[in-house]
Curated annotation (Swiss-Prot):
Name the UniProt record assigns to this protein: Cytochrome bo(3) ubiquinol oxidase subunit 3
GO cellular component: plasma membrane
UniProt organism field: Buchnera aphidicola subsp. Acyrthosiphon pisum (strain APS) (Acyrthosiphon pisum symbiotic bacterium)
Oligomeric and partner information: Heterooctamer of two A chains, two B chains, two C chains and two D chains.
Membrane topology: Multi-pass membrane protein
Molecular function (Gene Ontology), one example: cytochrome bo3 ubiquinol oxidase activity
């Protein structure tokens, strides 16, 4: 009996160590991916800066963009970041219902943000300010749409996490996925703050 308990202790210890190593590898892989994303967005921002500096008219402040709507989008995304933070807190407390609630709130805010962004694109296109208008709108659509695509995949990730929790419970693997999602979502918030400041706010001045 003592030998069995000793063996079980060793197995549990090995399992815990394996989970920690797996979590570390996944988080490290995520950071590598985010670094590549940073490079991609840095290139897009650089191209935008070059193009916008070579146009004679300030298109952002020329009443083409609805800045109040952009401000609301930013507020919604910041709220989603806050609710995402509460997801991690609830996870650490092993409160599955709270995880569900805050993930759902994060999803709703993110979805509204994405729909508003799509609506903005639609309004620009029907007013003949699409990506084929000139170089400025081409890089503008590329930059903002690239962020929007990331938001879209983030929403899919939320749905997959909700499904996995329902089927498997709060396993160590799912905890790692939640941590990875949280880092990814906060990264997207930071990128959007840069877009809002560098593109919209700076252009409106």
């Amino acid at each position: 009996m003592i030998e069995n308990k000793f063996n079980n202790t060793i197995l549990n210890s090995n399992s815990s160590t394996h989970d920690k190593i797996s979590e570390t590898k996944k988080l490290f892989g995520l950071w590598i991916y985010l670094m590549s994303d940073c490079i991609m967005f840095a290139v897009l921002f650089a191209v935008y800066a070059i193009v916008s500096s070579n146009i004679s008219i300030n298109l952002i402040s020329n009443k083409i963009f609805n800045l109040s709507s952009i401000l609301l989008e930013t507020f919604l995304l910041l709220l989603s970041s806050l609710s995402c933070g509460f997801v991690v807190i609830a996870m650490n407390q092993k409160r599955i219902k709270m995880i569900y609630s805050f993930l759902t709130i994060t999803f709703i805010f993110g979805l509204i943000f994405l729909l508003m962004e799509v609506h903005e694109f639609y309004e620009l296109i029907i007013e003949n300010f699409g990506p084929d208008k000139n170089a400025f709108f081409s890089i503008f659509f590329t930059l903002v749409a690239t962020h929007g695509v990331h938001i879209f995949f983030g929403l899919i990730l939320i749905l997959s996490i909700l499904y996995q929790i329902k089927k498997l419970g709060l396993t160590n693997s799912i905890r790692t996925r939640i941590l990875c999602f949280s880092v990814f979502w906060h990264f997207l918030d930071i990128i959007w703050i840069c877009v809002f400041t560098f593109v919209y706010l700076n252009g409106a001045i």
